[in-house]
């Protein structure tokens, strides 16, 4: 439920409303916009205080049918969120390119990749130090050594670093080295992990699960924001369908739908959707045309 306050509402009036809701057992998030203050009431049973809230001084409108993900919805925050990573802004006027290898394999490989993507115009280096694999026998990443190599590549090139965190107990370690923490598609429903990254300040890149709906993705983002971290970037990376010609099916419709439903920035991963490098440029152009705020592209020096 969302309460829209009158533009003339005083600070004391706002404080009284927040105090009433908190004393009633709800979490409260206040968003200031040019249209006025939006007060999101987070928690089950909000309808029990609807009548009392509607009658309070300063409340202009009550929206009881607000989405079940109030903190990430446009209803809560009409203006688009810009996620800043020092001088890199995702969701602003610039199309931000993130690029790099799927996994950090060696010092030579990641430094060569960093040099190449920087020269091509990327602002963020991607690379996996911890890799969740479908097979337990596949390469799982270099771990802490991979994080150290990513940090060295950042020092050398000035690129920001995004890398995946796969377990709650690794969040602090990854946050020590990375500028952006990635939640991969396989972990989009890992709620303990989502809550853990929500309790640290680094931006979070949330990839859509391969069989997840747009609403399920927004619920996952809500976990992160509800934990206290509003710096979330959403990533469409393709979903699993009956089609077998490509690795996944890139859901371009998700980009404008997400832009309509949420204030969070949206980027697209054309590489994991395509599965073949010759198709990546076309999907990347299509993603930009659909309104994506950035691209995350797989690049390998070999």
Please place each PLM-identified region on the residue numbering.
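Catalytic alpha/beta core domains of metabolic enzymes, predominantly
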Residues: 85, 200-299
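Glycine-rich, proline-tolerant flexible connector loops at the mouths of alpha/beta enzymes
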Residues: 126-144, 300-302
